[in-house]
Amino acid sequence: LLEIVHKELEEAIRPGISTWELDHLGEKTIRSLGCIPNFLNYNGYPASFCISVNDEVVHSIPNKHKILHEGDIVSIDAGLIYKGMHSDAARTHAVGQITPEAQKLIDVTRQSFFEGIKKAVAGNHLFDISNAIADYVEPFGYGIVEELVGHGIGHALHEDPQIPNFRQKRKGIRL
């Protein structure tokens, strides 16, 4: 269901649209699927989505005055509740034509996610995931945000375990 929401928003991304408009379109789509936006009013958060543009890291509040422009990159963090279960996923998109450097950032970031997923197998340790992400990203010279981490999800939006995207010295729990 969340992928349907992401696809709807991806199709709407264009120069001239505001992040507020994307938020309202996404909320309408979530509700049309019989779901509830799980970010809206979460710890006082005033929107259904976190929509960050360019160098904003995450959790930016949609705004009528924040207009997307050709060459921007926009990250949409979306979540919904369906039959008491939460989902949460972020996607980053190009707004029109972007620079090769911006495209490389999107590509490396996306692939780092899949490198981590490859390590999420029985017998490995939790932080094998973290280290795989760091191993992939570091040679490209990109920094990794250490204040935010991946997390479990289910009956609550944020559940254990926490999964850092940066290198860990310890192994973590066995999967």
Sequence positions of predicted segments:
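Active-site neighborhoods and metal-handling regions in enzymes and metal-associated proteins
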Residues: 1-175
